[in-house]
Amino acid sequence: MDDRMVDQSQHEDESSFELSLRPHFLKQYIGQASIKSNLEVFIKAAKLREEPLDHVLLFGPPGLGKTTLSNIIANEMNVNIRTVTGPAIERPGDLAAILSGLQPGDVLFIDEIHRLSSVVEEVLYPAMEDFYLDIVIGKGEEARSIRIDLPPFTLVGATTRAGSLTGPLRDRFGVHLRLEYYKESELKDIIIRTAEVLNTEIDEESAVELAKRSRGTPRIANRLLKRVRDFQQVNEDDMIYIETTKRALQLLQVDDYGLDYIDHKMMSCIINQYNGGPVGLDTIAVSIGEERITIEDVYEPFLIQKGFLERTPRGRKATPLAYEHFEAKNGKRDNFEY
């Protein structure tokens, strides 16, 4: 699967770009009003008690700000943060090395925490609850257990698959926060802020247009802005105007709903090759040359969310809205223009 403009996951070359755009404190963070309000209370209370913040579980779709919030938590608590991914902690010894290097009150951020191995997870339980580790040294008859006391710390876990977490791990988080898709008005504000960080002027109409096509996801909004800025600079315009924005999005093949060429290809297949469905996922995968799991996990959730696609016991089916949007009549014609 090629990197898509509307892919919610981070592209390989985007890490430093996203880092430069991140707000550092809650007052700078746009959107997720309920989460912000709750975190303000929890953080203030923890600081009044002079205790670390309770362990925090952040979950929701990719690109909504889980990593940003973890860094904000550390900044608000005025402590250091250590960042690691679940798959990178392969053995209990890896976890012990990370935890023993923390200072009192520090934040340990584990991204993709649902991918921790069961062996590592078992070692993590007492560390979260009672701040100690039991590590087995040696093998066979010479094996012995060593207890390592740990400084109090805050674990912030992030996952796009909260349902994949085991019950015991999930229950050890005192704070559960679900990140929701952003409103278009919030995305517009994010786009304007990002443009300021990039020293680029943008008219409000362009910010609204980009927000509308960003699938409720700041990562996509910032990515689209970055590409539209390329067109603006090549045109030698003094700012990003709506005409340039619309032309750029047309060339990038991102339509009014934030659907791209792959979404159009998939819906064209269902509507025109299979008369709108129902059609099985494996059949769709073969027809468009994609893996079944990629369609199920990456492509179809947004199409279902927007009401273009329906899951039925017999397979996937295009909705009346899909026919209307894709300009397909009776499953026989398409005119996929952006």
Swiss-Prot record:
SUPFAM superfamilies: P-loop containing nucleoside triphosphate hydrolases, Winged helix' DNA-binding domain. Keywords: ATP-binding, Cytoplasm, DNA damage, DNA recombination, DNA repair, DNA-binding, Hydrolase, Nucleotide-binding. CDD domains: AAA (cd00009). Gene3D superfamilies: 1.10.8.60, P-loop containing nucleotide triphosphate hydrolases, Winged helix-like DNA-binding domain superfamily/Winged helix DNA-binding domain. Residues 183-253 are annotated as: Small ATPAse domain (RuvB-S). DNA binds at residues 292, 311, 316. Has 3 domains, the large (RuvB-L) and small ATPase (RuvB-S) domains and the C-terminal head (RuvB-H) domain. The head domain binds DNA, while the ATPase domains jointly bind ATP, ADP or are empty depending on the state of the subunit in the translocation cycle. During a single DNA translocation step the structure of each domain remains the same, but their relative positions change. This is Holliday junction branch migration complex subunit RuvB. The lineage of its organism: Bacteria, Bacillati, Bacillota, Bacilli, Bacillales.
